[in-house]
């Protein structure tokens, strides 16, 4: 559903409808075999139960006619049939439920058992100086295929200053930023914040001190208020409104049918790119981190939207240590230093 606009723009409804049909038929085939087996058992069990009642009644009637059995004895035998059959029925139904539950539990367990690649070190502590200088000391990085992405990177960002990273696509700008919150771990070298090695900092403490505004904004399928509050779940409504005002999105929100309680759709499909971006900026305002990463936050916007967003970003960057990735000169003209990554 989140890609419905792409489907409509390419007029590929028939293709998606066919995919849906094929998937449904595969699901139906798997269920058909299951229900056929269960139906065979249920019908067989019902037939067996009916035959037992019939045999009991015929035999009981015969013995009653001979005077060897009373009507009360026949009723007791008939009741015993139900008592005998019922546990078997329950056992089979329970077996089916266990099989369904086990298959779901196995899938759940396979996800839960995945160990995160990056974890806290044994002696990790909270960040001591989140507003300190950020230093990349002889940093190198490569992915699992051993292809070198960054090779001996050295630079320092003074506390409260703004640095811009520019260069061709694929040069490693986003990778440099991703190393700071430890989305990846460096292959060699050292990254410090306020003189403290980021590997010695608890991940929660490290990442709570860093705000990230990305090009591809992800909004959850909830209300505007819930999406902004994601930056600080304990924030009051007044604080949420204040963050929205700083991001220049409050006036727009008030025009929505339910204001801050308006549902934004899965991934924010009911909002424009600029509106989603400003909500994500409000989210970071609410988080109020000392370190800010702007990863091509305006590259996908038109000029008019970019101007509005840039004002919000300038306000957000004030008095924060900021790393900006951008291709447009207008985005980085206020940076204290520009680094070219080639």
Task: Kindly give the residue locations of the regions a language model identified.
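Short intracellular "coupling" helices and adjacent cytoplasmic loop segments at the cytosolic face
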Residues: 1-19, 110-127, 142-144, 249-253, ...
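Regular, well-ordered alpha-helical segments
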Residues: 2, 6-9, 22, 29, ...
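An intracellular "coupling" helix at the cytosolic face of ABC transporter transmembrane type-1 domains
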Residues: 5-54, 93, 97-100, 116-117, ...
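Helix-loop junctions and hydrophobic alpha-helical segments within the transmembrane domains
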Residues: 7, 108, 242-244
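Short, conserved catalytic or interaction motifs in soluble domains
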Residues: 12, 69, 86, 103, ...
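Conserved catalytic Walker-motif region of ABC-type ATPase nucleotide-binding domains
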Residues: 20, 108, 136-138
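Helix-loop-helix
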Residues: 37-107, 111-112
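ABC-type nucleotide-binding domain
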Residues: 120-121, 127-342
């Amino acid at each position: 559903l989140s890609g419905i606009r792409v489907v409509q723009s390419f007029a590929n409804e028939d293709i998606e409808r066919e995919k849906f049909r094929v998937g449904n038929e595969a699901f139906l085939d798997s269920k058909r075999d299951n229900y056929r087996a269960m139906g065979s058992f249920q019908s067989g069990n019902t037939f067996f139960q009916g035959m037992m009642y019939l045999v009991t009644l015929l035999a009981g009637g015969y013995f009653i006619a001979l005077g060897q059995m009373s009507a009360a004895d026949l009723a007791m035998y008939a009741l015993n049939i139900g008592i005998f059959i019922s546990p078997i029925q329950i056992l089979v139904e329970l077996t089916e439920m266990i099989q369904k539950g086990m298959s779901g539990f196995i899938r759940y367990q396979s996800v839960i058992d995945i160990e995160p690649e990056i974890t806290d070190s044994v002696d990790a502590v909270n960040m001591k100086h989140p507003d300190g200088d950020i230093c990349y000391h002889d940093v190198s990085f490569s992915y699992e295929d051993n292809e070198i992405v960054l090779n001996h990177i050295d630079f320092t960002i003074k506390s409260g200053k703004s640095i811009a990273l520019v260069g061709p696509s694929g040069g490693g700008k986003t990778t440099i930023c991703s190393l700071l919150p430890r989305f990846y771990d460096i292959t060699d070298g050292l990254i410090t914040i306020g003189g403290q090695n980021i590997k010695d900092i608890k991940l929660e403490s490290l990442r709570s001190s860093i705000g990230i505004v990305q090009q591809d904004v992800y909004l959850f399928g909830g209300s505007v208020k819930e999406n902004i509050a994601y930056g600080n779940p304990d924030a009051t409504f007044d604080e949420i409104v204040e963050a929205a005002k700083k991001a220049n999105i409050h006036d727009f929100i008030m025009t929505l049918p339910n204001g801050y309680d308006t549902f934004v759709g899965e991934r924010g499909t009911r909002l424009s790119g600029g509106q989603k971006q400003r909500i994500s900026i409000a989210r970071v305002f609410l988080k109020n981190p000392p370190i800010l990463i702007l990863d091509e936050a305006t590259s996908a916007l038109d000029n008019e939207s970019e101007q509005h967003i840039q004002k919000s970003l300038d306000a957000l960057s004030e008095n924060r240590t900021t790393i900006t990735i951008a291709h447009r000169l207008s985005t980085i003209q206020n940076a204290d230093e520009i680094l070219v990554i080639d």
